[in-house]
Structure formats: C-alpha cells, structure tokens
Amino acid sequence: MIGELLMTAGVLVFLFVAWQLWIGDEIYSAQRTAQAAEQSEEWQAEFEASRPPAPEPDAASEPAAVEPPDMPKPGDAEWFANMHIPRFGADYNYPIAGGVTRANTLDPIGIGHYNDAVMPGQLGNFALAAHRTTYGKPFNRIADLRLNDAIVVESPNGWYTYRFRTLEYVTPDEVDVLSEVPQRPELPADGRYITLTSCSPMFSLAERIVAYGVFESYTPREAGPPAALTEGAA
C-alpha cells in the first residue's frame, strides 16, 4: 500500500514538473508574446492617432541619423518597452519592465531592467535579466546569438537597435558585467551598450551567461519599423 502511494506521488510530481517545464511554459510564453504584440499595436495606434502631416520627402537628401531620446526610469514592475530578437523567431516579442526581482518582474512579466542601469540608447550599459527556463523563458536561446545579430528594443516613441558582439560565462558574483563599460568598472561610459544576463547552465544557478551588444541606431516611430526587425529571423 505504501509502495503504491509512493509510486502515485512520484507520478504526480513528474507530471507537475513536466507541466511546469514544458507544457505550462509554452502556454506562458505564448501569453507573454501575445501581450507584447498587443502593446506594440497599441503604441502604433496611439502614434497614428496623434501623427502630424508628414512633410514631402527630399529625394536629394540622405536620411539623417537621429539622436535617441531619453526615457524616464521605470518604476518597479513598470512595463516600458518590448524586446525583439529576430534570431529567436519572427514573432519574438517580450515585455521589458523595471526591476529584476522574480516576484515582481521576472516571473510575472518577462524581462527585467537593472535599476542602476541606463535606459536604452543612453551612454552606458542598458542591462537586462530574464529566465532561461520556466516562466516563458525569454532568454532561452541566448546562446544561439551570432555576431551582428539585431537586438531591437521598442518603446512608445520608436526602436533602439543594438548589434550582438559576444557571449561570456561568469560566476553570479561578477557584477562588473553591469558596469557602464562592461567588465571595466574603472572606466567612464565611452559607448552605448546592451547586456543580457541569465542563468547557466540550463536548470542551474551555478553561473551566469552574459550577452553583450553595442548600439547601432534609433528609429523614430514616424520613420516606420527598422529593417533590423526582420533580419535573419528564424
């Protein structure tokens, strides 16, 4: 009798884990992606509703680089942007919110912004964290990034495009990856970086996997989505 109960309990535990890691996780991921896509559409609709008449284009002039506008720091768990990484799929679109606590941001929302990090497009390091497994696993495929892959951050006003440069594996206490110049805390900010952090290896907290990128351009919403959004989509 006891043996049967233990076997039943074991089966139930296995089913729960299977649900948590695979079936439930896929459902959660689809929900987050759908919510982010809906938010993207809402931002575009709000822009279209308030859009002034566009001036006639000057065929003789080259498009000028646009300086990215400053964004205010978000509150804890405040959704302020979406992330698109074409390498992870054409429909990859995840919310970014303030803070990196599991309870408030990483578990219920998706991608978290380190409170002391700069905002997208600013001089310094725009640093983010997300799960690699469970809760929608936004950074599940972080190790699949390739040199020059686009990492696009969408805000209500436009898109900030970064380009992936390299991966690194560190111990959890190596916080210098979050410095204004990653891994060089003694230096002042000399560029515009993005840093993505997650746990490594899979299903472990032993290390951190870190992806670094550099800022390429800002595309205001009136110019339309950047071509980078569809580059190399899996």
Residue spans of the language-model regions?
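N-terminal export and membrane-targeting signals
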Residues: 1-9
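Solvent-exposed, non-transmembrane regions of membrane-associated and secreted proteins
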Residues: 11-234
